Amino acid sequence: MGSLSEWVQQGWYKGSPWLVPLRPLSALVSFEARRRLQRFRKQRPRPPVPVLVVGNITVGGTGKTPLVIALVEAARSRGLKVAVVSRGFAGKTNHYPQHVTASSDALDMGDEPVLIARRTGVPVVLDPDRRNALDVAIREYAPDLVISDDGLQHYALPRSAEVVVVDAQRGLGNGRCLPEGPLREPATRLKEVDFVISTGGGWAGAYPMIMRPSGVTCLADNRTLTPDDFLRLHPQVHAVAGIGNPKRFFNLLSILGLSATPHVFPDHHAYQPADLAFTDGLPVLMTEKDAVKCAPFAEPHWWFVPVTASLPEGLLDQMLDRALGKE
């Protein structure tokens, strides 16, 4: 992680007096966020089809993508046609809208949209203007349900239900809005959404979500080992993570019993082969989100850990029912 980014995040989550002079700017961000939310409440446009927004109120990753995948799979198991809309953060393309498929380049389209397309096989429409992405998805794919990957603060996007994911390990930091703190909106926003989901531990008023590894897969040939089999063969590894909270991945590997040398990269990092050219020959283990970017130049000793979101029984159906207006 770059030193400036790391320094800022340490201030947000561990406290630092140098942030205090930024408070007036944070107050302006908080005021504007409240104003935009109030305007949205008054207008409250109805979406043409049910729209379920999965987002967060903090900067950085909280584990939204596994939840989006779980919701897509749950909806498809009910016979629903699903499309996903996304911004495609950190993708290189500047032509929109884009239709993301399993064969799309993650460096062009962004790692999360490509991961969703590969895991689910549903249409993914990319556009920073999420209202336009929604219109394109409806026109091109006639879905019964649209799930928005992020976009909670994009109030031009009409929605039927909102889900917020909170990283319980990091929490809301100092509770301040940008730039003094990590919040995109005031913490009171959590009281207004339909569901709050916590990853990495318990959170008051939230439903817990556990990331369960479904195996360890080789980037080069897609063969998969159980975590126990991988551990027996490779007890020591290099662990690579370019996600919002790398510690979450490293903790998972520790729980699996692996001895891992951690290597932290910025969220959405555009990997090059030299980034992973470790000289000791140990296997390299990474997140699935990192793997979609490293696959084009994968080596035989590079592996990733797919995870599945595990939630309380019936919760996925509750979220879908809320979005579909069945509650």
From Swiss-Prot:
Binding site residues for ATP: T58, V59, G60, G61, T62, G63, K64, T65
EC assignment: 2.7.1.130
Hydrolase among keywords: no
Coiled coil, from the record: none
Keywords, in A-Z order: ATP-binding, Kinase, Lipid A biosynthesis, Lipid biosynthesis, Lipid metabolism, Nucleotide-binding, Transferase
Pathway: Glycolipid biosynthesis; lipid IV(A) biosynthesis; lipid IV(A) from (3R)-3-hydroxytetradecanoyl-[acyl-carrier-protein] and UDP-N-acetyl-alpha-D-glucosamine: step 6/6
Protein name per Swiss-Prot or TrEMBL: Tetraacyldisaccharide 4'-kinase
Family to which the UniProt record says this protein belongs: Belongs to the LpxK family.
Organism taxonomic ancestry: Bacteria, Pseudomonadati, Pseudomonadota, Gammaproteobacteria, Oceanospirillales
Catalytic activity annotation: a lipid A disaccharide + ATP = a lipid IVA + ADP + H(+)
PANTHER family (UniProt xref): TETRAACYLDISACCHARIDE 4'-KINASE, TETRAACYLDISACCHARIDE 4'-KINASE, MITOCHONDRIAL-RELATED
Function of the molecule: Transfers the gamma-phosphate of ATP to the 4'-position of a tetraacyldisaccharide 1-phosphate intermediate (termed DS-1-P) to form tetraacyldisaccharide 1,4'-bis-phosphate (lipid IVA).
InterPro entries: LpxK, P-loop_NTPase
GO CC annotation, single: plasma membrane
GO molecular function: ATP binding; tetraacyldisaccharide 4'-kinase activity
UniProt record, GO biological process: lipid A biosynthetic process; lipopolysaccharide core region biosynthetic process
NCBIfam families, alphabetized: lpxK
